[in-house]
């Protein structure tokens, strides 16, 4: 079974190091056949991340994008990772700012996906702490968290000829739909999710498999206080993993 994991660093170097270290502690680096790790010319301190990635045998390559693009480049880089690894059985999409809190997360996701032949992909249960699901009100208030689209924070996609065609023609990137009174922003993977539905394929959201997700660390969207809290938590966890 060939699994390709794809992740992008976008000024999130400490978070990505934590993601990799927590993955290695819970799933093991060897459980993934190919690691397609990219960096968007990050301007934060990348030294510890690059050193750890090199040590585990999964060097990080430049994506060709920078941190100052006028658009969200995430889906474009994920597409690049899929197109460069066409012979994989599964693709694992990983946000840089997730932390693995459960053992054998990926084999369990694959098993759940394989139990549903009408599903093209599966994402984890959304969680802020890796222990509890986010409040129902938060999920209901923002369907883009996981219900209206496959969220790429930790998702497994089954490779099929249809997936390859849609990745080539539709991609995983963002779109904007224009209406007379407003514009609708379609976040990463949302258009792909909608097109998959026209082919009678759904995406799953696990009820029990979860990771901790910091959310919104690549862009300056949080208050200074919340951003500092996330960074402090990340550093605390990194100290524990680094020993």
Could you say what each language-model-derived stretch is?
Residues 2-7, 23, 34-37:
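Hydrophobic targeting segments
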Residues 12-27:
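Short, well-formed alpha-helical segments that are part of the catalytic scaffolds
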Residues 38-49:
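A conserved acidic beta->alpha catalytic loop
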Residues 52-84:
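Active-site-proximal specificity loops/subdomain of glycosyltransferases
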Residues 63, 122-127, 206-207:
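Short glycine/serine/threonine-enriched helix-capping/active-site loop
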Residues 88-99:
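Short beta-strand-to-loop acidic/aromatic patch adjacent to the donor-nucleotide binding site
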Residues 101-180:
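Conserved catalytic core of nucleotide-sugar-dependent glycosyltransferases
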Residues 175-243:
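C-terminal catalytic/acceptor-binding lobe
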């Amino acid at each position: 079974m060939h699994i390709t994991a794809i992740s992008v660093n976008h000024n999130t170097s400490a978070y990505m190091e934590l993601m990799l270290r927590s993955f290695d502690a819970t799933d093991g680096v060897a459980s993934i056949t190919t690691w397609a790790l990219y960096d968007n010319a990050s301007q934060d301190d990348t030294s510890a991340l690059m050193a750890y990635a090199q040590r585990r045998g999964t060097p990080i390559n430049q994506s060709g994008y920078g941190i100052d693009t006028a658009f969200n480049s995430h889906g474009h880089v994920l597409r690049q990772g899929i197109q460069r690894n066409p012979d994989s059985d599964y693709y694992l999409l990983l946000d840089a700012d997730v932390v693995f809190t459960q053992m054998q997360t990926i084999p369990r996701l694959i098993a759940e996906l394989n139990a549903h032949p009408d599903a093209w992909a599966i994402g984890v249960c959304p969680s802020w702490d890796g222990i509890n699901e986010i409040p129902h009100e938060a999920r209901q208030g923002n369907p883009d968290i996981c219900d209206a689209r496959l969220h790429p924070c930790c998702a497994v996609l089954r490779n099929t000829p249809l997936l390859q065609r849609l990745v080539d023609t539709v991609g995983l990137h963002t779109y904007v739909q224009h209406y007379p009174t407003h514009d609708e922003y379609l976040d990463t993977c949302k258009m792909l999710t909608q097109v998959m539905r026209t082919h009678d394929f759904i995406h799953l959201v696990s009820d029990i498999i979860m990771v901790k997700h910091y959310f919104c660390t690549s862009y300056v969207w949080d208050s200074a206080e919340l951003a500092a809290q996330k960074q402090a938590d990340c550093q605390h966890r990194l100290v524990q993993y680094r020993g």
